[in-house]
């Protein structure tokens, strides 16, 4: 537990120290924000800062810092290092700059920022990539809550219809009508659950592996037949929302359109990511209790289910922990965490997709018919993907694994965009260059070794990942030299 408490403190210090440095690099000022200059009562709506923070936190979190941390905890204490360093030096920086650059550019979405800084070709690729990613995420978060709710009441089909209907309404309505009113309540429940679990951990003080016990893959050592993934690159794909997630780059612009002042960007964007990291640390620690502090009730159940993938293992941990540790109240909170959180992530995913497409088509979103023009084909594509997912036994796991890689690849686009911006503005670009190079290597290597992609031996994957790193370094060095010549 010592590593856990050190990690919690490190995240807080990271926000206060490194977050302050990152804010000075960007230099926010008092210029009018899009929420004021472009107020339209639909997507550009100024809201109270506390409400914007709570919505941003839930938008970027969903079940990510819960399920991702649970699946990443199998690697052992190495998960702590990735959550802490990834969150402070990569994820929070990524979220802050995508939100602030959106605010500085009239509330534009990530593809528009990519077009401005990386060029039209990269923007077109990212546009298709981002929309596909968001539709895929929304689809995943239709089926999984429906399956869980089916176990309580009604049929899966009924819940799918109801969740889809909610998505359509939430995507079409002004942002302050449902999202602005309901999301803060769900955010509070997630935070309350995390605080309650910390209290239980303090009382129980379980004997968990510490950093000084080694950074090897403890899951593989404890159960080689069940846990077969390598720490690199799998840990850095598995724990995304608790460290760095490209999905956040599609969500930060939503709240960039709702802030009255640039000076609140650090607590909103950087702070929400640090908060998500805190939640991820809690759930990683709780999960290690089940994996490594044996005997624990339900451990055999979880270990036996782990080879069946995400749907059976992560929610099982959540339910066991909340019911055994927090009682009846925990059961209610588990329902909010496992059902409400993915649904809220799903509807903001579709909303972001609508706005990205609308910006690309220059289609005003105030008229209802213009929103329908985009939403109808958007949800039709999602429905087709959902049908495929339901008719294939491993459809959910397949889509989720592709989402994990696509999600982190999106963060690569965002980090390189921010790096180019910092170079052009003569600002310290190394703060995003290093994360960009690292995530480029991670995503390339994972694409090579993943069984859902090329499935090559790890030796080959590492070699290709190393080549990608070298190519990225050379490309950046050549590009920066050309930029420096033009600036002279």
Q: What positions do the PLM features span?
A:
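Extracellular loop-to-transmembrane helix junctions
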Residues: 2-19, 72-102, 111, 331, ...
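Selective recognition of specific alpha-helical transmembrane segments in multi-pass small-molecule
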Residues: 4-17, 130, 134-138, 170, ...
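Membrane-interface "cap" regions at the ends of multi-pass membrane proteins
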Residues: 10-66, 264
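Hydrophobic, membrane-embedded alpha-helices of multi-pass small-molecule transporters
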Residues: 47-64, 200-206, 217-283, 333-345
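Loop-to-transmembrane helix boundary motifs in multi-pass membrane proteins
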Residues: 121-127, 131, 158-161, 271-280, ...
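Extracellular/periplasmic helix-exit of transmembrane alpha-helices
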Residues: 202-214, 271-320, 390-394
């Amino acid at each position: 537990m010592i590593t856990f408490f050190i990690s919690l403190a490190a995240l807080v210090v990271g926000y206060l120290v490194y977050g302050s440095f990152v804010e000075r690099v960007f230099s926010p000022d008092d210029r009018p924000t899009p929420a004021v200059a472009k107020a339209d009562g639909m997507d550009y709506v100024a809201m109270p800062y506390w409400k914007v923070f709570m919505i941003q936190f839930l938008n970027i979190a969903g079940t990510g810092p819960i399920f991702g941390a649970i699946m990443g905890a199998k690697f052992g204490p190495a998960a702590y290092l990735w959550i802490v360093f990834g969150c402070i030096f990569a994820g929070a920086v990524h979220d802050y700059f995508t939100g602030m650059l959106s605010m500085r550019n009239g509330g534009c979405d990530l593809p528009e920022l990519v077009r401005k800084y990386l060029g039209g070709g990269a923007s077109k690729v990212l546009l298709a990539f981002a929309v596909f990613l968001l539709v895929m995420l929304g689809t995943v978060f239709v089926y999984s809550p429906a399956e869980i709710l089916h176990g309580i009441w009604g049929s899966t089909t009924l819940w799918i219809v109801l969740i889809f209907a909610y998505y359509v309404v939430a995507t079409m309505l002004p942002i302050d009508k449902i999202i602005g009113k309901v999301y803060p309540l769900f955010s509070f429940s997630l935070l309350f659950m995390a605080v309650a679990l910390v209290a239980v951990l303090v009382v129980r003080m379980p004997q968990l592996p510490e950093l000084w016990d080694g950074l090897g893959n403890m899951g593989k050592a404890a159960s080689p037949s069940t846990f077969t993934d390598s720490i690199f690159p799998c840990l850095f794909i598995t724990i995304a929302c608790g460290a760095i997630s490209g999905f956040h780059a599609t969500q930060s612009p939503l709240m960039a359109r709702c802030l009255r002042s640039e000076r609140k960007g650090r607590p909103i964007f950087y702070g929400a990511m640090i908060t998500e990291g805190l939640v991820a640390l809690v759930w990683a620690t709780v999960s290690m209790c089940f994996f490594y502090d044996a005997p624990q009730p339900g451990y055999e159940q979880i270990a036996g289910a782990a080879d069946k993938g995400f749907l059976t293992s992560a929610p099982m941990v959540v339910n066991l922990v909340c019911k055994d540790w927090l009682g009846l109240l925990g059961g209610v909170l588990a329902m909010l965490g496992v059902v409400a959180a993915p649904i809220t992530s799903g509807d903001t995913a579709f909303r972001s997709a609508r706005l990205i497409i609308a910006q690309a088509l220059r289609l005003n979103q105030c008229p209802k018919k213009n929103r329908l023009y985009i939403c109808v084909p958007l949800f039709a594509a999602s429905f087709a993907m959902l049908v495929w997912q339901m008719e294939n036994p491993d459809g959910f796991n397949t889509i989720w694994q592709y989402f994990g890689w696509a999600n982190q690849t999106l963060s690569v686009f965002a980090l390189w965009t921010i790096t180019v911006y910092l170079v052009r503005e003569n600002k310290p670009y190394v703060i995003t260059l290093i994360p960009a190079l690292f995530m480029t290597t991670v995503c390339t290597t994972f694409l090579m070794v993943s069984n859902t992609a090329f499935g090559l031996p790890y030796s080959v994957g590492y070699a290709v990942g190393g080549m990608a790193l070298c190519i990225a370094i050379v490309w950046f060095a050549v590009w920066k030299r050309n930029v420096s010549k033009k600036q002279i």
